Amino acid sequence: ADFYLSKERWDEAIEIYEELETIGGFEGESAEYYQKFGYALQKRKKYAEAIQAYLKADTLKPDNIWNNRHLAICYRLNRNYQVAITYYKKVEEAAPEDTNVTFHIGSCLAELGQYEEALNYFFKLDFIENNCIKAWRGIGWCSFISQKHEQAMKYYEKIIEQKPLAIDYMNAGHVAWVMGDIQKASVFYGKAITASG
């Protein structure tokens, strides 16, 4: 199984890990076996099954940062944002300046409609990683949804000065529209169409 895992042959690794688990081959083994099994499942996008393997690893070796990170990822990809946040926050305790963790906590909070709290994480990300466009996108969107239109426009304009995507022009257009600047909105919408090809 480890050989197949090292060669990124996920299906073969999963097959062997499943057989080992069926015959009791994992009994007495370390959490690492369940982590490897979970990782192979995760790579095949079998997130619910990966979560089960990672949870078994957690019972053998509680609060392992690698395991918690992968539980968070799988819960997020399975759209269980509240539980994902729980595991991301465990990782955050051990690595408070991990920019990926900060971003994903903010993103999960935004998915749950907790925009004010999400903003705090996106501002933290912008502080940790100077000129962070993905933080600016989060700030722009959460500000827009929270009716903080001037703040939203400030961040969309910063993005547009750097590396804008079509969606950035579109969102800037939405902000300009609700602020009553139809002329500016139409320019942004036009740029969104051009940028999207």
Question: What is each PLM-predicted segment?
Answer:
Residues 177, 182-197:
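TPR/TPR-like (Sel1-like) alpha-helical repeat modules
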Residues 29-32, 66, 100, 134, ...:
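Start-of-helix register in tetratricopeptide repeats
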